[in-house]
C-alpha cells in the first residue's frame, strides 16, 4: 500500500498528445523547441476515482510544425539526440491546428458547435424571410409577420 492516496499512472510517456503552450529556441544553434502540456490520469485509491493532472514536456520541433495552441503528438527520443537534459521528446505531427476545427466524420468546418455551411444557410434564410418583408413600407406588424411565415413555408417546401 503506498503512503499516499494517489497512484501515478502506469501509462508510459513514449507517445503523448498535448497542446503547445510555449515555443522557444535553445542553445547556440538556436534549436526550436516547444513546451507541450499533456494530461495524464492519477488514481485516488480512497475516492476510487481518476483525476486529470497536467504535465509539461519539452519537445524538439526541428521543422517548426506547430504554433501555440495546436494539439500535437510527441514521441520520446533517446538520450544521444537530446540537445539538453530536459528536452525528452520530439514533435511527431500536428493533430489539430488551433482555430481550425474540422469534423473528422463529415470533413466540414465547425464554429462553436455549428457547421460553417449551416451558418451561411441560416444567414441567407434570415435575409430572405425576415429582412425583405421589413424593407416594405406601410405594412402593419401582423401583415409583415404573415408574409414572413409564408416565405418561410415556401423555403421549407423548396428545400424538401
From Swiss-Prot:
GO-annotated cellular components: mitochondrial small ribosomal subunit
Keywords in alphabetical order: Mitochondrion, Ribonucleoprotein, Ribosomal protein, RNA-binding
Protein origin, superkingdom: Eukaryota
GO molecular function: RNA binding; structural constituent of ribosome
GO process annotations (BP): mitochondrial translation
Compartment list: Mitochondrion
Assembly description: Component of the mitochondrial ribosome small subunit (28S) which comprises a 12S rRNA and about 30 distinct proteins.
UniProt similarity note: Belongs to the universal ribosomal protein uS17 family.
PANTHER family found in the cross-reference section: 28S RIBOSOMAL PROTEIN S17, MITOCHONDRIAL, SMALL RIBOSOMAL SUBUNIT PROTEIN US17M
Name of the protein described by the UniProt record: Small ribosomal subunit protein uS17m
Amino acid at each position: 500500500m503506498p503512503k499516499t492516496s494517489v497512484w501515478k499512472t502506469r501509462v508510459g510517456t513514449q507517445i503523448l498528445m498535448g497542446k503547445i503552450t510555449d515555443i522557444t529556441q535553445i542553445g547556440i544553434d538556436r534549436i526550436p523547441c516547444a513546451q507541450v502540456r499533456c494530461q495524464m490520469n492519477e488514481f485516488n485509491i480512497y475516492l476510487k476515482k481518476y483525476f486529470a493532472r497536467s504535465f509539461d514536456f519539452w519537445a524538439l520541433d526541428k521543422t517548426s510544425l506547430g504554433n501555440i495552441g495546436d494539439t500535437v503528438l510527441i514521441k520520446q527520443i533517446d538520450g544521444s539526440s537530446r540537445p539538453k537534459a530536459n528536452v525528452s521528446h520530439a514533435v511527431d505531427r500536428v493533430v489539430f491546428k488551433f482555430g481550425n476545427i474540422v469534423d473528422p466524420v463529415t470533413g466540414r468546418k465547425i464554429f462553436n458547435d455549428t457547421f460553417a455551411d449551416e451558418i451561411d444557410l441560416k444567414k441567407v434564410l434570415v435575409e430572405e424571410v425576415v429582412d425583405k418583408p421589413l424593407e416594405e413600407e406601410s405594412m402593419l406588424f401582423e401583415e409583415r409577420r404573415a408574409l414572413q411565415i409564408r416565405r418561410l413555408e415556401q423555403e421549407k417546401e423548396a428545400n424538401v
